[in-house]
């Protein structure tokens, strides 16, 4: 069905909790995903895996679960759809991950957030009408924001994605924030990404 409608990429958006890295049936997930990768190729599709923060658990050998997935199921059977919010929230540098998997990230989820202990990078471009809104303690560990209103260095992420051959930047707004509707958040994010100072 995906091939019929002209879809090029299909993505595993998440896995059951008993199949995440370090869980009891992680090996089952790896086996099934490899099979899906082969099936996708037979239909001219590219299978991708979308991460969350729980893939950044350390495996017994010290490797992150996310890296274990892509080592075990190498390209071209599986590519990554990096969710840049969850890379950062897990304590890693999303620019470094874009560089690490350059050439193997056809799509990304661009998402901004604030969180306890997270500091906005110096000199991040603040577009008129899109001010940085600090974290409120009652919002939990990660509070989502429209792109450009959180801690992410969005211009650096856009540049790294472009350099690595990313085809699609997908704005994701899991929940509305700052009193804006989901559509208002999405428009704010898209307007920020279209700004020439962000998307050079």
What is each PLM-predicted segment?
Residues 1-80, 100, 183:
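Active-site acidic/histidine proton-transfer and metal-coordination neighborhood
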Residues 6, 60-62, 66-200:
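Histidine-acidic metal/acid-base catalytic patches
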